[in-house]
């Protein structure tokens, strides 16, 4: 059985008929809208531990700006989350280097967990990633260091003004 995991892109948020337009085979899709890479990796590992019949994993990593924190349970946060934790994190601590280290650490962790399960990784991306000045040790350790991004899948050149829309792609 194939397991799908990721954020709203994998969940099917951009589809008018999410259930009707989905992959035709029987499959679990544990993706959630707004899910951070931290929670996606945790949820994926837990799901596979509880469902050892999974034969293949298709994992979509989210934009690196999403993180999680623990306060009465695990919660996702973004620069637009309206709470004290998010405001403090994104104002005083957040950097592109932290974001990218967290992304590639999550890729590496999931890759290691899935070493005996065939898998495919792809990811959403954001232009601000290009401002990172240092390469990342976790990126160097994973075979997915050059994984396909949503921008690659859309098929327009990087220089095209509509290369990446301002929200979810349309059907």
Residue ranges and their predicted role:
Residues 45-171:
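Alpha-helical cap/lid subdomain in secreted, periplasmic
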Residues 1-43, 49-50, 170:
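Serine-esterase "nucleophile elbow" of acetyl-processing enzymes
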